[in-house]
Regions:
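Histidine-centered nuclease catalytic patch
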Residues: 3-56
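Acidic, low-complexity intrinsically disordered regions
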Residues: 13, 80-84, 115
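Polybasic, low-complexity binding patches
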Residues: 43-57, 65-107
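Zinc-coordinating Cys/His ligand positions in small cysteine/histidine-rich zinc-finger domains
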Residues: 60
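A boundary/linker detector
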Residues: 1-12, 99-102, 113, 117-120
């Protein structure tokens, strides 16, 4: 039997959220309540973004599709980004460390011109 090919992205971020292991994470990177969840590239691949966790966030499918490959800051605000990351402070599972995610993702965003002061 031929298996269908999936071009969707998966990551520990999405799988841990779906398993209910990230209960503090209720809003997506755009400030919307998480429902039909997809992996969002913070920096789109077409703009040089990588496919790794430091460039991943969770987003509702419709917003992700509407954004497509447009720059992140055309679809969200620094306040929404900071609120997104604050949901992960001190969150730790067997497979995911929220503080490391914040550190690495904000460093990656800074390298791409988006500077955030998450820690205040």
């Amino acid at each position: 039997m031929i298996q269908p090919i999936s071009f969707g992205y998966s990551s520990v971020l999405k799988s841990e959220w779906r398993k209910g292991k990230l209960p503090s994470v209720v809003k997506d990177v755009y400030g919307q309540i998480l429902e039909d969840v997809t992996i969002e590239h913070l920096i789109p691949k077409s703009l040089g973004g990588k496919s790794n966790i430091c460039n991943y966030a969770l987003a509702n499918k419709l917003t992700n599709e509407a954004r497509s490959n447009k720059p992140l800051m055309e679809f969200t605000t620094k306040e929404n980004l900071i609120a997104w990351f604050l949901q992960f402070v001190d969150v730790k599972t067997e497979k995911f460390d929220g503080n490391e995610y914040i550190k690495n993702a904000t460093k990656y965003l800074a390298k791409n011109g988006i500077k955030l002061d998450v820690w205040g």
